[in-house]
């Protein structure tokens, strides 16, 4: 359901990889690299176009990633371009590729050894290789961003969605010959390629098959034959000479990029959502100013001493599972990046244990196991195996996430913000912004002292206080109080090797081997931040009751070491929404949308035109991360930055719809329910 089938290959006499699934070579027996350069780079006139290109990023899409040779070759070419023309407008290459049967890491490495000139790029690509999960995974290289979509292109290409209409500059139509892979080469594919191509966008392909040529012409391309590579007589290339703009299929969820004139962006917040949004914006060259109402950063929901880091693998909506797995993998990338930059924070990639402590949790974990995740992501363990993983006896089975971890959120956020200041981030603390007003093509921010600050774009990332503004007051967000207990360690508790999750969580000892974090309460619509003796007791009772053993021979004495008597705890107020899914994107104009869509149920039924969603211009938000901010913030921040800059988005359209800030009232309106 979520995982994809790996490729099966062998090397022929010419040492060329051959697919067992398609009984076809991945590239020419003569010279795969020369073929790639001739067919795809020259066929799309890349170098000549880059020299005169006036935008900041160029987008290439490819229909079959295969060995990654096309990616390595064009990334190397773009690096040469940037080195030769560092002051030209074009700064970044986006490479979108689709792959139904991904090659395992060891086979990629074996094939790439044929091309030692790409050894550094190949190593970075192979280091990124994690589990191939249905959907998009984003990987960053020096000058290139790779969006690798795993799964059938017939399922994934439509998931680029309304947003990507007219945004792709060039296509590499690859993916085995049409006679060997007829399921891919079809009229629907050609129509979608045309839909996503920019006016004057191009394609190139190794084939000259009549059905392919006619299909591309029928879709709207002007198609030319050119000399084929090597022994092939001909191949095809073409251009989209059209400025046609089709109506969006889902206009009520259509995201809108910013109108960027000066790239002057303000972020209101001070936690992990603000951090990763600022990081992604700074990497794009933005001038970013952060406004935080507290004297220090990370004093609210991002301020715990230790936090658990792992994906949510069970949900009634598979979109949420896919989102959290992709977010987890992306966050792993970013954490490794932070470590390489020398950003100091306590952490331990010790794995996370999920306990089947009652019938409901056992059913939930059984459902997770049924998805057949790879063992590197999730392992189903009996109670003896789970006990061994955590280092303490348990009387229940469960699951284990080997790549899970604990880290120190406050330390990470504060030190990472200090690093971002070196990249140009301006931080203004003790600045509570009380009002937003859009005038003269910019946002005017007003603080409690009635001082004003002007910025072109604003991102709201201030947790449950997102709704403090007139523009956001109708968003159905609410505060959730959470108290995390800090308990002393003991000889028994020092044996805990992994994060332990039940109807709460217990972390291993901190780096000083002095204390553990025990969490956490969950009180809706409560933003009080005073210590609660009752919640402290409940944190203790949850672990002792959930994990208590009925086996008198089982030594569970370690549970009695959970000592809350010092009454040390930290209280934070998280931001949540009823469906417990984050929100990210444009700030919707509630009143205008209710007016435009008051009759949307009948408009859809009659197939009448529906306007695009009304949004507040250049105003964005990221929020409702709940207790999953460590996992979700990095990918959400990257997606939001990509949206602001009109770049490809690293999430499928169905997931983006599920993250849309207006989803609560749009779902009602689509059913014909009146919104007041």
Swiss-Prot record:
It is found in: Cytoplasm. It comes from the Bacteria. It catalyses: 5-aminomethyl-2-thiouridine(34) in tRNA + S-adenosyl-L-methionine = 5-methylaminomethyl-2-thiouridine(34) in tRNA + S-adenosyl-L-homocysteine + H(+). The keyword Transferase applies. Signal peptide: none annotated. Its EC number is 2.1.1.61, 1.5.-.-. GO terms for cellular component: cytoplasm. Gene3D superfamilies: D-Amino Acid Oxidase, subunit A, domain 2, FAD/NAD(P)-binding domain, Vaccinia Virus protein VP39. InterPro entries: FAD-dep_OxRdtase, FAD/NAD-bd_sf, MnmC-like_methylTransf, SAM-dependent_MTases_sf, tRNA_MAMT_biosynth_bifunc_MnmC, tRNA_MNMC2, tRNA_S-uridine_synth_MnmC_C. GO terms for molecular function: flavin adenine dinucleotide binding; oxidoreductase activity, acting on the CH-NH group of donors; tRNA (5-methylaminomethyl-2-thiouridylate)(34)-methyltransferase activity. Pfam families: DAO (PF01266), Methyltransf_30 (PF05430). Transmembrane segments: none annotated. Residues 268-676 are annotated as: FAD-dependent cmnm(5)s(2)U34 oxidoreductase. Its cofactor is FAD. GO terms for biological process: methylation; tRNA wobble uridine modification. Keywords: Cytoplasm, FAD, Flavoprotein, Methyltransferase, Multifunctional enzyme, Oxidoreductase, S-adenosyl-L-methionine, Transferase, tRNA processing. Residues 1-241 are annotated as: tRNA (mnm(5)s(2)U34)-methyltransferase. In the N-terminal section; belongs to the methyltransferase superfamily. tRNA (mnm(5)s(2)U34)-methyltransferase family. In the C-terminal section; belongs to the DAO family. Catalyzes the last two steps in the biosynthesis of 5-methylaminomethyl-2-thiouridine (mnm(5)s(2)U) at the wobble position (U34) in tRNA. Catalyzes the FAD-dependent demodification of cmnm(5)s(2)U34 to nm(5)s(2)U34, followed by the transfer of a methyl group from S-adenosyl-L-methionine to nm(5)s(2)U34, to form mnm(5)s(2)U34. This is tRNA 5-methylaminomethyl-2-thiouridine biosynthesis bifunctional protein MnmC. It comes from Histophilus somni (strain 129Pt) (Haemophilus somnus). The gene is mnmC.
